[in-house]
Amino acid sequence: MNRILLILILLISLTTKLFSNPNIQARTGILVDYHSDEILFELDPDAQIYPASMTKIMTAIVAFDLIKTNKLSLNDQFTVSENAWRLSQAGYSSMFIMINDQVSVEDLLKGIIIASGNDACVALAEGIAGSEQNFADMMNEKAGEIGMTSTNFTNSSGINDPDNVSTVTDIALMSKYLIKNYPNYYELFAEKTFTWDRTGGEPIKQGNRNPLLYKNVGVDGVKTGYLAVE
């Protein structure tokens, strides 16, 4: 089994000339200047893809919108369901929350953004909307508002689902919305570690799942995503 790494990067200032003849082994991709919206490079940008963990960008945006309108607080506590806990036991990237743990929205967001925890996504989605499906409806409503015309979300984590689809064009729109509207929260995407002080156990420290943060190439956040393929 191989893994496909999906990476989207929005860079602040690069010249078009630099990317006139890129050597990129990918089926689809896009590079956008944040300030001007100029497309510096694109490769079949409207091809349908499975966004994998880049789905979590929208999960965070929905939460940030609710916090902004005082419908949610970073200090709110959500109870972890068995449904959320099971994802921490399934070999996926996890925050390692346990059934009936009381976890703050702030910790869940860090678990999602830094540790890319699928279990944290479900706990947050259920806490906000009552079910992950209801939360996915909120995600799709927001996607429509942003202008993501080729995207459909079916879950909060990006876990494999043939109907959870997007394009790199839409992901670029979503990423810019995040950076523009929530610059303070966007800083979380650049944090290299997160320590979960779990109940009844030793703290769990995890590194950011974005490998580009460690390569000193000027990347300041957003997400990567992995898909397993036969």
Regions inferred by a protein language model and the residue ranges of each:
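Sec-dependent N-terminal signal peptides
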Residues: I4-S13
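Active-site-adjacent loops and short helices of periplasmic peptidoglycan-processing enzymes
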Residues: F19-A172, K176-K180
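Domain-terminus/edge residues, biased toward the C-terminal soluble/receptor-binding domains
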Residues: M148-T149, N160-V165, T169-E230
